[in-house]
Swiss-Prot record:
Comp. bias regions, Basic and acidic residues: 100-126
Residues bound to ATP: 199-206
Motif (DEAD box): 315-318
Name the record gives this protein: ATP-dependent RNA helicase MAK5
Gene Ontology CC annotations of this record: cytosol; nucleolus
Region (Disordered): 53-132
Domain Helicase C-terminal: 428-594
Any GO MF annotation of the entry: ATP binding
First-listed, main subcellular location of the protein, grouped into a coarse class: nucleus
Alphabetical list of SUPFAM superfamilies matching this protein: P-loop containing nucleoside triphosphate hydrolases
Keywords noted in UniProt: ATP-binding, Helicase, Hydrolase, Nucleotide-binding, Nucleus, Ribosome biogenesis, RNA-binding, rRNA processing
EC number: 3.6.4.13
An annotated GO BP: maturation of LSU-rRNA from tricistronic rRNA transcript (SSU-rRNA, 5.8S rRNA, LSU-rRNA)
Length: 733
C-alpha cells in the first residue's frame, strides 16, 4: 500500500466511461468519469477524497487540468477555495508549499474577475428582456409575422377571431377558405360548446376540431398542461392527424417539437413514456384507445394529468355505435371521469364528436335480407337517435350542438360512382383492365387479407407498380409502403403509368392519401358505412374522384340493392315504388371488349403465377411452424403423421394443387414476359397506321394518345362518367 493523501476531485486521475451505442437515451449523463480505491469523507460539511499518491496527478499535470473552465468558474465558491488551501497545508513538503498557494491566489483572482464578467453579462441580458414571461412562456414570444397579415385570409378572419400563429399556418398550407363544416362548427367550438358534427369525407373535419384546441393551447398560461386529447380508430389516422396539426403549428414546434404527440400501438411504448416526461410535451395528444389506456394504467400521474384537459375529441366516432368496439375507450372515460369529478373548481371537459356517418342503419350487414328500419319516432332525425345512443357511453357537459354539413347526401357530390358487372372469378381481370385503361393513382379495397396479398402479387407480375397495406403488417411496414406508394405515384403521374395501393379496411377511415383519383371496391363491403368511408379516400378537399364497384350477379341482387337504398336521399326514397330496382341507380362503366380480350390471356398467366407464389410461401411457413413446435415439445415430426390430421392434410393438398413445378413455372413466366412486350391495340389494328379514323402514325410521332394502348385516345374515368351522365339526361329530354 502506497502513502495515502488528501486530494481535491480535480487532482485525482479520473478514467473516462464509454457509454455503449445501443443505449437509446442516456438520461442526460454525458462525459462520465470514474475512479477506484478512493475513500470519501465529509469533514465539517466539506467533502474530502483520500487516495494513494499514484492516483493523484503530478504537480504540472494538475496545474494544467486544474485551471477551471468557464462553467466551473461560475459554480465555484469560497468554500471550495478554503478546502483547497487546507489540503495544500497538509502536504509534507513545506518548502514547496508556498508555490501552490501563490498559484491558488492567482487563480482565485482570475475566477473573481470572470465571475464579475458573467454577472455583468447577466445584467445586460436582464435589461434586454425585462419581462420574465418572455423567457419562459413559449407561446407569448413575439414571432416575426411580417410576411403574413390577417387580411390575407379574409375567408377565415371574417368569420372567427384566430391567433396569428394559426393564420400563418393556414396561409402556408394554402387553406384560404373555410369549408361548410368548419364555418358551422369552429365558432361554436371556440365558445366552449359540445358539438356533434357530420360532414362528408374529405371536407376538413380535422381542422374543424383541431383549430379550437390549438387556440386554447396558445391562450393557456400553463405550458406543462395537456389541453386536448384526440381519439382515432386507427393508427394511420392518428399519424395523419398529428402531422396535419403539426403543419398548422409549425412555428411553435420550432421551440418544442413534442408539443403535439402521437400515442399509438405498434411503436415503442418506452420512447412514448420518455417523451411524455419532457417539459412542455404532449400539449395536444392524438391517440388510439388501446395504447392510451395502457399508458395511463401504468402511470397514475399521467392519468391525473390527462384528466385536466380542456377538450376531448372523438374522430370517426360512429365506430363507438358498433357493439363490442372500443371497450378500451369506455374504460378511459371512466378513469379520467373519476379523477375529474374529484378535482375542485373544474367543470367537465368540452366534447367534440365528428364523423362522416351517423346512422344506425348504415352499420347493418348488407348480406342481411331484412329491410326494416330502426323504430325511431317520426320526428326524430338520424343524428338525434345516434346522440341518444352516444349519451349512454359519453358524459357531455351539456346537450351537444348537432351540425350536419350535408344532410341530404351521404356520399360527397364530388365522387362519381360506377359499377362493373362481372363473373366472380373475373375480378382480377377487370381490375387489370381498369388500371390499364385509366392510369393514375388507384386505391383498391378488398374484404380479406388473402385477397390483398394475391391481387398485389398478380398486378406486380403484370408489371404494374403495386403496394399493399393490411392489418397483419407491422405499423412500420404499413407506413413504409404508404411512403413508397406516394413517391412512386408522383413519379408515374408524369409518365402516364398506373400506381396501385391495395388495402384492407384498415385504410378505409380518415386516411388522406394525396392524389387518389380512383377507388375500386374489389369486393362489396359488409356495411354501408364502410362503403362511404372507402369511397371517401378520393375527392379530397375541392378535387373530384371516381368510385367503382366490381360486383357479381349474386351481389347485385341482394347486398347491392340494399346498399343503394341506404345511400339514397330522402327525395329518391319518396319517389320510389315497391318494385324499384335500386341496383340500377348507379351507372355502369363502359367496357371496351376488344381491349379486354387482349388482356385475358396475360391475366390468366399472371393469376396462376401469383397463386403459386402465395401457396408455396404458405407451405414453407406451415412446415417451419410445425418443425418449430415439434422441436419445442421434443417430438420427432414425420410427414406421415402430418397427413393423419384431416384438416392439415386438406389444407396442404389445397395449397399443393396451386403450386407449379420449376419447368412449368419458368415456361409460364417466359410466356407472360413475351405477352407483356406485345403492345395493346385499339380495335386490334396491326397494319395501315395512317388509315382509318385515327392517324396512328401521327399520334406515335407526336407522342399523343394513350400511353398503354396504341390508337386509343387519352381517357379519364371521371370524364367518361360525366359524359355518360350528360348523354343520359339528353335522351330523357
Amino acid at each position: 500500500m502506497g502513502k495515502r493523501v488528501v486530494a481535491t476531485d480535480k487532482e485525482l486521475k479520473w478514467k473516462k466511461v464509454d457509454i455503449p451505442d445501443t443505449l437509446d437515451d442516456f438520461g442526460g449523463f454525458y462525459g462520465l468519469e470514474e475512479i477506484d480505491g478512493v475513500d470519501v469523507k465529509v469533514v465539517n460539511g466539506q467533502v474530502q477524497f483520500i487516495a494513494s499518491e499514484a492516483q493523484v496527478k503530478e504537480e504540472e499535470e494538475s496545474s494544467e487540468s486544474d485551471f477551471p473552465d468557464f462553467d466551473a468558474m461560475e459554480q465555484e465558491d469560497d468554500g471550495d477555495v478554503e478546502e483547497a488551501e487546507e489540503e495544500e497545508e497538509e502536504e509534507e513538503d513545506v518548502a514547496e508549499a508556498d508555490e501552490p498557494e501563490v498559484k491558488q491566489k492567482q487563480e482565485q483572482a482570475r475566477v473573481e474577475q470572470i465571475d464579475k464578467g458573467v454577472d455583468s453579462e447577466k445584467h445586460e441580458d436582464e435589461k434586454e428582456t425585462p419581462e420574465d414571461d418572455l423567457a419562459t412562456n413559449v407561446f407569448d414570444i413575439d414571432v416575426d409575422l411580417s410576411d403574413v397579415g390577417s387580411g390575407e385570409l379574409p375567408g377565415w378572419t371574417d368569420t372567427v377571431d384566430l391567433s396569428m400563429t394559426t393564420i400563418n399556418g393556414l396561409s402556408n398550407l394554402g387553406f384560404t377558405e373555410m369549408t361548410p363544416i368548419q364555418k358551422l362548427s369552429i365558432p361554436a367550438a371556440l365558445e366552449g360548446k359540445d358539438i356533434m358534427g357530420k360532414a362528408s369525407t374529405g371536407s376538413g373535419k380535422t381542422l374543424a376540431y383541431g383549430i379550437p384546441i390549438i387556440e386554447k393551447m396558445i391562450k393557456s398560461k400553463d405550458n406543462l398542461r395537456t389541453n386536448g386529447i384526440i381519439f382515432t380508430p386507427t393508427r394511420e389516422l392518428a399519424q395523419q392527424v398529428t402531422k396535419h396539426l403539426q403543419n398548422v403549428c409549425s412555428m411553435l414546434l420550432k421551440k418544442n417539437p413534442y408539443m403535439i404527440l402521437s400515442l399509438t400501438g405498434g411503436l415503442s411504448i418506452q420512447k412514448q413514456e420518455r417523451l411524455l416526461k419532457y417539459d412542455g410535451s404532449a400539449r395536444i395528444v392524438v391517440a388510439t384507445p388501446g395504447r392510451f389506456l395502457e399508458l395511463i394504467e401504468k402511470n397514475e400521474e399521467l392519468m391525473k394529468r390527462f384528466a385536466k384537459i380542456d377538450v376531448l375529441v372523438l374522430d370517426e366516432a360512429d365506430r363507438l355505435l358498433q357493439d363490442g368496439h372500443f371497450d378500451e375507450f369506455e374504460k378511459i372515460l371512466k378513469h379520467l371521469g373519476r379523477i375529474r369529478k374529484s378535482l375542485k373548481n373544474m367543470e367537465y371537459w368540452q366534447t367534440l364528436i365528428y364523423s362522416a356517418t351517423f346512422s344506425t342503419d348504415l352499420f347493418d350487414k348488407l348480406a342481411n335480407s331484412s329491410w326494416k328500419k330502426k323504430n325511431n319516432s317520426k320526428d326524430e332525425s338520424e343524428m338525434e337517435s345516434v346522440l341518444k345512443h352516444l349519451m349512454t357511453k359519453i358524459n357531455f357537459k351539456s346537450k351537444p350542438m348537432m351540425i350536419d354539413a350535408n344532410p341530404e347526401d351521404k356520399i360527397s357530390a364530388q365522387i362519381k360512382e360506377s359499377l362493373i358487372e362481372c363473373a366472380p372469378l373475373e375480378r382480377d381481370l377487370y381490375c387489370y383492365y381498369f388500371v390499364t385503361l385509366y392510369p393514375g393513382t388507384t386505391l383498391i379495397f378488398c374484404n380479406s387479407i388473402e385477397s390483398v396479398k394475391k391481387l398485389n402479387a398478380y398486378l406486380i407480375n403484370l408489371g404494374i407498380n403495386s403496394f399493399q397495406i393490411h392489418s397483419s403488417m407491422t405499423q412500420k411496414n404499413r407506413l413504409k409502403n404508404l411512403e413508397k406508394f406516394e413517391a412512386m405515384a408522383s413519379k408515374n403521374n408524369h409518365l402516364g403509368k398506373p400506381t396501385v395501393l391495395i388495402a384492407s379496411d384498415v385504410a378505409a377511415r380518415g386516411l388522406d392519401i394525396k392524389g387518389i383519383k380512383h377507388v375500386v371496391h374489389y369486393h362489396l363491403p359488409h356495411s354501408a358505412d364502410t362503403y362511404i368511408h372507402r369511397s371517401g379516400r378520393t375527392a379530397r378537399g375541392d378535387n373530384e374522384g371516381v368510385a367503382v364497384m366490381i360486383c357479381s350477379p349474386q351481389e347485385a341482387m341482394g347486398p347491392l340493392r340494399k346498399l343503394r337504398r341506404l345511400l339514397a336521399s330522402k327525395e329518391q326514397i319518396s319517389k320510389s315504388t315497391k318494385n324499384k330496382k335500386w341496383q340500377q341507380t348507379v351507372p355502369l362503366l363502359p367496357i371496351e371488349i376488344d381491349i379486354l380480350q387482349q388482356l385475358r390471356e396475360r391475366s390468366s398467366l399472371a393469376n396462376d403465377i401469383a397463386e403459386h407464389e402465395l401457396a408455396s410461401r404458405s407451405l414453407r411457413k406451415d412446415s417451419n411452424w410445425l418443425k418449430q413446435a415439434a422441436d419445442e415439445l421434443g417430438i420427432d415430426m414425420d410427414s406421415d403423421e402430418e397427413d393423419k390430421d384431416i384438416i392439415l392434410a386438406k389444407n396442404k393438398n389445397k395449397k399443393m394443387n396451386k403450386t407449379l413445378d420449376k419447368n412449368e413455372l419458368k415456361s409460364m413466366k417466359a410466356e407472360l414476359t413475351h405477352l407483356l412486350k406485345i403492345p395493346i391495340r385499339k380495335d386490334m389494328r396491326r397494319s395501315y397506321l395512317t388509315g382509318g379514323l385515327v392517324n396512328l402514325a401521327d399520334s406515335l410521332v407526336k407522342k399523343r394518345g394513350h400511353h398503354n394502348i396504341i390508337g386509343h385516345e387519352k381517357t379519364d374515368a371521371l370524364n367518361v362518367l360525366k359524359k355518360g351522365k350528360s348523354n343520359k339526361k339528353q335522351k330523357t329530354k
